[in-house]
Amino acid sequence: MDLLTLEGWLDNTAFAVLFLTMLLYWCGAAFPQWPLLTAAGRTGMAIANLCITGLLAARWIEGGYFPISNLYESLFFLCWGLTAMHFVAESISGQPLVGVVTAPVAMGITAFAALSLPPEMQQSAPLVPALKSNWLMMHVSVMMLSYATLMVGSLLAIALLVVTWGQPVNLKGSSVGTGSFRSRRPEPSLEASTGNGGTTVLTPPALQLSLQRLTLAETLDNLSYRMIGLGFPLLTIGIISGAVWANEAWGAPWSWDPKETWALIVWLVYAAYLHARMTRDWQGRKPAILATVGFGVVWVCYLGVNLLGKGLHSYGWFF
C-alpha cells in the first residue's frame, strides 16, 4: 500500500469512527444506565486520534516537512488537537458529557476535510518559500493546539448554557471554580390541601434544577475555565512566535494582516474571559456566554479569514 492510498484510507476511517463515536456518546448521555456506551465512545475517540496521527505521519514522510502547510493538513491537525484535548478534559473531570460536545465537532472537521475539499486541495505540495522555516512547526502547531484547547473549553461553556437554559442559577465560589455553591432566585410555589385540614407547599418541578444538573453545571463551569486557562497561554506563545517569524521573513513583526488582526481579537476575547473570572469572580452563565462568543471568533480567525483570500496567511484559500 502506497502512502497516498494509506492517507485516503486513514482520513475516511477517522471520519467513520468519529461519526460512530458521536452516536455512542449521545446514546451514553441518553441512557446513563449503560456505561458501556460511554466506554465504547472513549475507545472510538482514541482510535480516531490514532488514525489522524498515522495520517499526519504519512504526510510528513511523503512531503518531507511538518504536515500543517495547507487547509487539509491543518484541519486534520486541528482535529488531532481536539481529540487529544478531549482526553485531557475527560481525565480531569471524569465527565462523559465532554464527548457529547467534542465528538460532533471533531466529526464535522474530518467530514469537511475528507469529503468536501477538492482532491487538489488534499494533495501534498512543495512549501512556498515563506514557509520554508523552522518556525513553521513552532508557530503553526502551537496556534492550532491553542485553537483546539480553546474550542474544547468553549464547547463545555456552551454545554453549561444548555444545561442551565431558562434557569436563574448562579454559581459562586473562588475564581478558579473550586469551593463553589449554588444559589437560585426565589421560585414561586403553590399551596395544596392535604385532605386533613393542612396544606403542603409545592414547587413546580419545571422551575427547579435538580441537584444532579447543578453538580453538572459546576463541573462544566470549572472544566471550561481550566481548558481556556490552558489554551490562552498557548495562544499567546503562538502569536509571539508568529511575530518573531514575521520579523525574520518580512522585516516587520506585525502588519495588521487579517489573520493577525483576528488572532488579536481572539486573544482579547479570552483575556476578557479570564479577567472577568479572576478579578470579577464571574462564574456560571455570564462567562459561558463570553466563551461562546470566543468559539465563534476562533472559527472566524481560523477559517473565515481564509474566505477573503487576502493577506500573508491566505495559504488555506480554497475557492
Swiss-Prot record:
Residues 175-201 are annotated as: Disordered. HAMAP family: CytC_CcsA. The chain crosses the membrane at residues 14-34, 46-66, 74-94, 97-117, 142-162, 227-247, 254-274, 288-308. GO terms for molecular function: heme binding. GO terms for cellular component: plasma membrane-derived thylakoid membrane. Disulfide bonds: none annotated. Belongs to the CcmF/CycK/Ccl1/NrfE/CcsA family. This is Cytochrome c biogenesis protein CcsA. May interact with ccs1. NCBIfam families: cytochr_II_ccsB. InterPro entries: Cyt_c_assembly, Cyt_c_biogenesis_CcsA, Cyt_c_biogenesis_CcsA/CcmC. Residues 191-201 have a biased composition (Polar residues). One of its GO terms (biological process) is cytochrome complex assembly. Required during biogenesis of c-type cytochromes (cytochrome c6 and cytochrome f) at the step of heme attachment. It is found in: Cellular thylakoid membrane. Keywords: Cytochrome c-type biogenesis, Membrane, Thylakoid, Transmembrane, Transmembrane helix. The gene is ccsA. It is a multi-pass membrane protein. Its main location: membrane. Pfam families: Cytochrom_C_asm. It comes from the Bacteria. The keyword Transmembrane helix applies. The keyword Thylakoid applies.
